[in-house]
């Protein structure tokens, strides 16, 4: 089956909102010139939404442009289940930057920390059919211009023939002639079932208000198990050296892998409202019949306290995939080609499971120790042909310092897994403790250079008046600090104070004729 794409409408029970605030929210700099969407009503009615569809023989995807361009549904036709948490109603609660927010599917958050300005607003959308720019596959691109920064974002959701993975291509562009901050996280909702297991290849994490903690075991508690999170919290992995993360549901024998080059998408987050009553109230606030959800998020940066600058007119893009798994009993490792489950038990017996997204006939799965093969078996692997077995590795497996599991096909190595994983063998450079950031130096003791760095951080966080104050203070302490003149010149330029901007930038050039930022 080729990839088909079409548009129609779907009807969803929708809890109504009153009119948006007619006035721009001047007191909320993080949303200006957007208005608030905070008049949430208790009445509901059936509403039709434009739905864009992609479908191949393995996956059926629905995107809703009128709800921020979110992926509303991704149905795994092989396993017969929704890949993500599908919320059958549109029931907003006060969560997003502008107020109203709905749960479910995959949402895309840009430029400012929090649920995006357009999460409950229509965005542009277009379809690329097979044979167009999408090649053999088909794709849906949703896009918008963020009014707070005038930067452009676009997400292309694509399917390929015979490929069970949902492809996500991210494009960001700074349309302005000055630097400005940016931020990106893809937020996938999944059902909050008691047996949910996280697969995050890390051994340190930033855990809510606890600072840096050991992961997954912390104070006798396995943080990789959803049921062990009684209260609402976030987990951000900190020392990830792999390109994957995801989850698995043993009861359903199904799960999910997210894959992306960590040079482009290093952030790996888990969020839950918690299992106690205080967290479960969000079930009634956000849905009618679909239960609780959790979030697996993939981000541009390590955690959501980080912004970076985009240069003037800079554009950037990268690729991510979401791959549904099933029938392999869990998973511990993944590559671009394969996913592996490996559980070593007593007396050298191991549970082994494997899956590949494309078909490989006669693939070889092998377990070795000290370059000696302890066990191997051949199998036909594919998305609709998961492989599982119990392998008898013998006593040598219990004595070996490490085991190497490989999946090979067609003369290529599709996956290599070292047990125990490399990231568990060496100490992290991060120290576990109640605080993961030192107390800042008092401002009156800061050097001009330190004040400049604080001003940059304030600019990154959108606190421009604070940045101005810090750069002016830096110049009081060192009048030859050209970087402070550049910072003030940029602030003045953005505010239309062109003569003041010219004076600051000229002073920076006079101090250093090689200051190309000031010359620009």
Residue ranges and their predicted role:
Residues 3-15, 52-55, 62-73, 81-83, ...:
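A contiguous, surface-exposed recognition patch within enzymatic or periplasmic domains that forms
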């Amino acid at each position: 089956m080729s990839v088909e794409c079409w548009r129609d409408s779907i009807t969803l029970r929708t809890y109504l909102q009153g009119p948006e605030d007619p006035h721009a929210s001047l007191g909320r700099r993080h949303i200006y010139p957007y208005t608030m969407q905070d008049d949430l009503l208790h009445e509901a009615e059936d509403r039709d939404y434009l739905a864009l569809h992609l479908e191949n023989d393995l996956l059926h995807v629905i995107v809703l442009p009128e709800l921020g361009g979110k992926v509303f549904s991704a149905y795994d036709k092989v396993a017969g289940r929704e890949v993500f948490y599908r919320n059958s109603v549109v029931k907003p609660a006060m969560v997003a930057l502008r107020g109203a927010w709905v749960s479910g599917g995959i949402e895309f958050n840009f430029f400012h920390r929090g649920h995006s300005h357009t999460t409950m607003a229509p965005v542009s959308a277009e379809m690329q059919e097979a044979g167009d720019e999408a090649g053999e596959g088909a794709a849906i691109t949703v896009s918008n211009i963020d009014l707070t920064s005038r930067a452009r974002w676009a997400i292309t959701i694509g399917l390929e023939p015979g490929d069970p993975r949902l492809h996500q291509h991210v494009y960001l562009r700074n349309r302005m002639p000055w630097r400005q901050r940016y931020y990106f996280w893809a937020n996938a909702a999944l059902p909050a079932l008691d047996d949910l297991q996280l697969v995050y290849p890390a051994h340190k994490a930033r855990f809510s208000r606890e600072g840096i903690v050991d992961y997954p075991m912390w104070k006798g508690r396995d943080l990789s198990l959803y049921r062990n999170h009684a209260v609402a919290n976030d987990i951000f992995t900190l020392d990830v050296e792999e390109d994957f993360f995801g989850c698995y549901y043993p009861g359903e024998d199904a799960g999910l892998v997210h894959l992306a080059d960590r040079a482009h998408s290093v952030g790996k987050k888990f969020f839950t409202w918690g299992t106690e009553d205080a967290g479960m109230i969000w079930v009634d606030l956000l849905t009618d019949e679909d239960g609780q959800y959790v979030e697996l998020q993939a981000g541009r940066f390590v955690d959501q306290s980080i912004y970076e600058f985009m240069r003037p007119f800079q554009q950037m893009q990268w690729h991510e995939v979401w791959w549904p798994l099933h029938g392999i009993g869990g998973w511990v490792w993944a590559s671009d080609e394969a996913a592996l489950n490996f559980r070593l038990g007593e007396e050298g017996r191991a549970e082994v499971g494997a899956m590949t997204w494309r078909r490989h006939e006669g693939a070889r799965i092998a377990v070795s120790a000290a370059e000696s093969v302890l066990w191997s078996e051949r199998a036909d692997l594919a998305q609709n042909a998961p492989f599982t077995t119990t392998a008898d590795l013998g006593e040598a497996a219990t004595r070996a310092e490490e085991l190497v599991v490989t999946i090979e096909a067609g003369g290529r190595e599709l996956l290599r897994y070292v047990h125990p994983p490399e990231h568990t063998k060496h100490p992290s450079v991060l120290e576990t403790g109640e605080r993961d950031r030192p107390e800042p130096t008092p401002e009156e003791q800061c050097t001009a250079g330190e004040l400049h760095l604080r001003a940059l951080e304030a600019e990154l966080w959108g606190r421009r008046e604070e940045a101005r104050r810090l750069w002016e203070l830096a110049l009081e302490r060192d009048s030859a600090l050209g970087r402070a003149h550049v910072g003030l010149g940029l602030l003045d330029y953005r505010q239309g104070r062109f003569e003041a901007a010219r004076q600051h930038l000229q002073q920076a050039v006079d101090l250093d004729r090689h200051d190309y930022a000031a010359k620009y």
